[in-house]
Amino acid sequence: MTATSNSAPLAGGSLSSSATAQPPQPPPGHQQQHPLPQIYDSQMQYYYGSSMPNQPIPTYTAQNGAPQQFGTPPYYQDANGQFGQVPAQQQMMTAGHPYFYMAQPQQGGQHVAQSGQPQIFYYQQPLGQMAQQAAPMYFHPMQAASTPMLSEQMSMMPQIQSTNPQQSEQLRKSGAQISTTRTVPLTSSTPLPTSREYETVQRDRNRNSQSRYQCPIEHDDLPIDEISKITIDNHNDDTMSAEKENRFNKNRVEKLGRRGFAKPEVDSQLPHNFKTRLCMTHAAGINPCALGARCKFAHGLKELRASDIPTRYPNNKYKTKLCKNFARGGSGVCPYGLRCEFVHPSDTEFQNIPPYQRKMVEEHDSIPEDYVVARYQPRFMHTSGKATTPTKVTLKQRNVAGSMMCLSNTGRDLEAGGDFNHPEINENDLPPHLRRIRRGNPPVTRSRPSFSTKWTSVENLGLRGHY
């Protein structure tokens, strides 16, 4: 059995005859088991496996808890003819494999110069599953450098050498590695890495790949000091919000003190109107306030505080005009509610506004009429949220009534004033600009023409009009 030792050596002490026990001399004639001439590289080092009898060391030892069994530490013979024991941490031969790698022997920090001829490699006891061979194993160096050989391919190498070209072609189709070039011993010009060096290379490669593509860090990979800085932000919690607000005020006071300003009290940092009015959402009691402790309005009488600043300058026009949302064309709903500065129908100031504004509210709340045959149509049509009852008038009656209305002068009033231009309307109920018009041009009472027919009568049509 053959082996090569071209892997990188591990750091260790010198392997000399004085440091290790000298094994007995190998049996004579062991080197004469190679009758055929071989091709060797003068820069490489070769080892032949053989057993050393009468050694009480066990045949196999398990390393690193691996299920496979490895051979016991062997001895080697240097150029001076001295025997040295291979360290136990070196990679051992696996039972059933045709070769293994070993580090070159060292003396201190220097490699031991070996001759180009093969060296005999002695085992303390024979390995049962390893059959001895008279000649070293041959393989192509490019195959070992390009792809690693599996254990099944390694065991097939002795069989491949004895096959003919036809069998080699069949094995090549099955996936076996076969070399048709000149064979050389199991050597390599580059030392093979050890297990520790291989792990170091893999670790560096993984580090480079992560720095290039910047893989995300899992939560388990975060340092402990960074995990301690992670906090839970319950912004909806009243207690947490109050603590955060107090901490913010405290930090603000400290920053002002470091900049040379006088440190004001914490209460002076709050707005002057903070918690001076009740929160309408909280006072309604329907839904809780979403702001919680961060709300600037008072949640109850306990939080309500008196303001130290004087009240604002009074607004002389406060609650003196009707809100446009309740006038003609309005929606009937004010989004400002009690905060609106205009008069609502539910306010006590509603009785203080002019009568014409109150009439606009009454018209807004009244049910709209069908003005098809009415005498006076309103200038501003509006819609209401209330459902109207349709007037039961047939299409024939509408057409006849419309044609008769065109013959009379009672269809509509074309003069200025609209609905307010009637003699029976009180002057106090008119807007200011219409009052001035009425004083200059009083309304003229019109008489109904004599040829008015029954089709203009509201009683016959079932309608109500302003006559």
From Swiss-Prot:
GO terms, biological process: regulation of protein localization
Domain of life, source organism: Eukaryota
Outcome after substituting T190A: Abolishes phosphorylation. Severe reduction in binding to plk-1 and plk-2
Bias type Low complexity, positions: 1-22, 179-195
One GO cellular component, as annotated: cytoplasm
Predominant location category: cytoplasm
Effect of loss of the gene: RNAi-mediated knockdown in mex-5 zu199 mutant background causes a loss in plk-1 asymmetric distribution during the first embryonic cell divisions.
Keyword set, alphabetical order: Cytoplasm, Developmental protein, DNA-binding, Metal-binding, Phosphoprotein, Repeat, Zinc, Zinc-finger
C3H1-type Zn finger ranges: 273-302, 317-347
PTM (free text): Phosphorylation on Ser-457 by par-1 promotes localization of the protein to the anterior cytoplasm of the zygote.
Matching SUPFAM superfamilies: CCCH zinc finger
Keyword NAD assigned: no
PTM annotation (Phosphothreonine): residues: T190
Effect of T190E: Phosphomimetic mutant which severely abolishes interaction with plk-1 and plk-2
Bias type Basic and acidic residues, positions: 196-207
Function: Functions with mex-5 to affect embryonic viability, establish soma germline asymmetry in embryos and establish plk-1, pie-1, mex-1, and pos-1 asymmetry in embryos. Also affects formation of intestinal cells.
PANTHER family listed in its UniProt record: CCCH ZINC FINGER/TIS11-RELATED, PROTEIN TIS11
Assembly notes: Interacts (probably when phosphorylated on Thr-190) with plk-1 (via POLO box domain) and plk-2 (via POLO box domain).
Name the UniProt record assigns to this protein: Zinc finger protein mex-6
Organism in which the protein naturally occurs: Caenorhabditis elegans
Native organism taxonomy: Eukaryota, Metazoa, Ecdysozoa, Nematoda, Chromadorea
